[in-house]
């Protein structure tokens, strides 16, 4: 009984702390109700999950919105892992990662294509400067995919 109570308290504390960090009512990155497929701190085969994963009901091409204003701090495209991924650094010090994307917004896609042609490679990773690609809260930054 005591062990069950401790486990319940730990789970409750975890949920409360996640709720304060990720109030999905205010920060929904999609235009559909949030259904999580992965949660922060969830045990994976060889690590703890470091984010939340949102289900898209198998739909590709949904608009993906920025959680808050900031700037694109990293873009990585690879055949494995996250596939197309976008990292946005926010003024409060947090970084949000948007992964498994089908494509980026036209503003970002234009810069990505230019870098790909310059490097003659589909797979790229680069770190834009702070003033290079700024985004606003709720700006469309990408479209959902299945990579």
Regions found by a protein language model. Give the residues of each.
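N-terminal low-hydrophobic presequence detector
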Residues: 1, 99-102
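Charged interaction patches that mediate protein-protein contacts
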Residues: 10, 94-97
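Surface-exposed, glycine-biased beta-strand/turn segments
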Residues: 17-85, 89-95, 102-107, 121-123, ...
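A solvent-exposed, charged loop/short amphipathic helix patch at secondary-structure junctions
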Residues: 111-123
């Amino acid at each position: 009984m005591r062990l069950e109570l401790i486990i319940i308290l730990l789970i409750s504390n975890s949920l409360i702390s996640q709720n304060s960090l990720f109030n999905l009512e205010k920060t929904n990155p999609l235009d559909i109700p949030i259904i999580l497929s992965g949660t922060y701190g969830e045990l994976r085969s060889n690590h703890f999950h470091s984010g939340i994963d949102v289900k898209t009901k198998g739909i590709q091409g949904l608009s993906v919105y920025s959680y808050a204003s900031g700037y694109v701090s990293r873009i990585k495209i690879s055949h494995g892992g996250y596939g197309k991924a976008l990292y946005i650094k926010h003024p409060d010090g947090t970084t949000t990662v948007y992964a498994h994307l089908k494509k980026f917004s036209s503003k970002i896609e234009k810069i990505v294509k230019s870098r790909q042609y310059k490097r003659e490679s589909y797979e790229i990773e680069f770190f834009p400067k702070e003033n290079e690609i700024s985004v606003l809260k709720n700006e469309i930054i990408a479209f959902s995919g299945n990579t």
